[in-house]
Amino acid sequence: MKPIPSPEPPGQLRLTPRRKDKGEAEWERHRTRERLEATLAGLAELDCLRHRQQLLVQNVLSPGTHGQDAAPTGDSPRSDEQKLLEENISLLKKQLNCLRKRDAGLLSQLHELDKQINDLKIDSEKTEETDSRPSSGFYELSDGTSGSLSNSSNSVFSECLSSCHSSTCFCNPLETSLNLTDGQAKSAEDFLEWLDYRESQHETGTVRCSFSAPHSNSVEVTADVHPKYQCDLVSKNGNDVYRYPSPLHAVAVQSPMFLISVMGNIKAEEPEEEIGPNDNDDCIVPELDHLKDEDSFLHQSSLCSLPLSSGKKMDGYILSIIHKKAHPVRTNKPRTSVNADPGKGILRHGSICVKQTVGVSQSNAVNLKNSKQTCLHSAGMISVDNSTYPSLKPCSKESLSEQLESKRMPSISTYPSCNVNELQSQNNSRNTVKSVCQGLARGSVAMTSNVQKENVTPNAPANLPNASSSVCNGSPRESTQNSALLPQEIKVVPPVKRVSLKNTLLSYHESSSFEERPPLDFKSEGSSSQSLDEGMLVNAHYIPAQQHGVKLHKNTKNVKIVKSSTLKHRADVQYVLENGSQTLKEKSKVVGKKCRFPEDLDTNKKVKKSTPRVKKIVHPHFEPAAVGRNPVAVRSGIKSHGHPKDVVLAKPKHKRSDYRRWKSSAEISYEEALRRARRRVQREMMGVCAQVPFSHASPYAYIASDSEYSAECESLFHSTVVDTSEDEQSNYTTNCFGDSESSLSEVEFVGESTTSSDTDESGGLIWSQFVHTLPMQATATAELQTTAKAFIKIKASHNLKKKILRFRSGSLKLMTTV
């Protein structure tokens, strides 16, 4: 192949495979030479312009006869040249200003682009501060002349686009891609300046004269310059023509943006002069149309810009969509939910909910779905900030009650939350439960003086009952703290939102257990999704027993015992609490999440398998009657025995999975200890406790006689008081109380949880917490105010739970959530 001569265009040099290195060296030399020549040509042109300006200034400053005589002969053409020089100088000044602005604008633009990338949004209005920034690709061109808005070399030429290049001289694909990354709106000031300049061009003919008139002079000055540097430049795309010579040309072509967009592969150093781009574009058209009209040139350039506007519109549209979608609003709803229906999701995925709700009770941003599972208070000791809960209202029927609750619980957040571990470490369960009793008693509007006597400790905040209900997210029963309003509360309970109602009822029972509310009867059975609605509350008061070793874990087997303490004197309450603290410490040794006695493992599995999803028996029309009859049942239940009796919900025996169990040696020793404790305490408490006979709440419910082990069981439950984090783990609680010695041996709590997946893992057995009031015998409502109910939640393993159920107490309400 023939050696490539140096004057050949650089593109051909790169196409020679044999002499690639040599060609590159020659190309570098060629580029350097051309760059120097272009610089020389630019300097020569500038020198020519300087001479013209000097002549103009001299003619202005030295008026005289000589100047006047010379004026008619030779100054008339010079005066035109001087005008042109003035115009060119003004253009140069404008261009320098543009360059200064552009230097500052690029830096600020980079910072803003970084911010935009970080924020995933494009701010198209900040660049109005820097007038000479590159145009955004977001704005379509208003007309052909405003095509400069899409210049990648933008700010250098935007104001004073002289005849050297039109407003869209840089519209090519590469330039378009640069514009897309720009993300900046074109300054209106630059555009207005450019319009003013264009008008001045058309008025004075500056463009044509600047190209044609100084041509001869520039040729004289730059006679030694290569002629190609004196030619107009046509860009690669053929749409842009850069006319020569213009004082603006020498400055504008040095823009790196211009070089990148027009020359692509050429370095930024080449276009030192308007002549440099001629080399780079390889489209040198010698002496191309110097006399072509500026209007026609602008028209051509505007045509170049129009095809790109649609693409820029699309890009702007896409970016605007990105901007809109950048920051979606986060809602209070959880990112993931096990089920669309919060009630069913919690019921059927209790094990999942257990792990989610470990720390829910102390967080202020808890969803209702989690708040339902919040650890209900160990004797009401854990309080949750009420302010978060009224906002969480997935249950439409609880909204009103939540509002009432929020009004009635202004200071719940101030109440310190205490867990059972704190009670253990401090051995302070006595004082804490007393304070709980007092706080709950204060929460009730219609408490009697007897209850006030019980609730003596002044240091307990009065809003504790509300705190317990706030965990349940505004239970409808907390909304009406007054025991006289109990009928309304019962009416609030329809099983529309099952999980939430269950929790609300649970919170209600927690609060009302200290608030002299009557023990409520419930329907015997409930379906899997509704079992939470239909639980059976057992009225109970806790009696201390001897110590038992059970270690309490917050995240593990949670057993809830809702106790409804009857009228007790202060000393008795203190005594109960003292024994409770002892038993609490001992119980802290036993329970692990999977901790089960060997004899109970099979039973737990059978409970899961055998307990069917019981059909729900809902009689909403019975609710008014039940409301009217609750007081009677309460009074009668209080008067019959030394402690209140249970209206226990019994499942048919054929449905019982663990109807009878053989007692282990541990259980037998348990019974003996409980007997001794009960005998000791019963003598002390006998005169204090009122006796209330209970009517049957349902075909399966019957009056609970005073069991031999009721006192021991109560103390056992009291000693294991713990806030439970799972209300919804199980719908039914299998009654394991029944043994030959217990009068309630035949009793069985409402079935096992329908969450069969949960019962294996957590062995959750639960008393259903919802009041579906069956007709109850009418009794006086006076006892509603005198019955102080206490919720005692027990967190226990399967074996402990079964033992507790075996020693079924007549005054206990057991809610096992393990």
Swiss-Prot record:
Cellular component, GO, one term: nucleus
Biased composition, class Pro residues, residue ranges: 1-10
Disulfide bond sites: none
Record key words, sorted: Coiled coil, Cytoplasm, Developmental protein, Neurogenesis, Nucleus, Wnt signaling pathway
UniProt keyword Coiled coil, yes or no: yes
Coiled coil residues, start to end: 79-130
Domain of life: Eukaryota
Domain free text: The C-terminal PDZ-binding motif may mediate interaction with the PDZ domains of DSH (Dishevelled) family proteins.
Protein name as it appears in the record: Dapper 1-A
High-level lineage: Eukaryota, Metazoa, Chordata, Craniata, Vertebrata
Gene symbol of the encoding locus: dact1-a
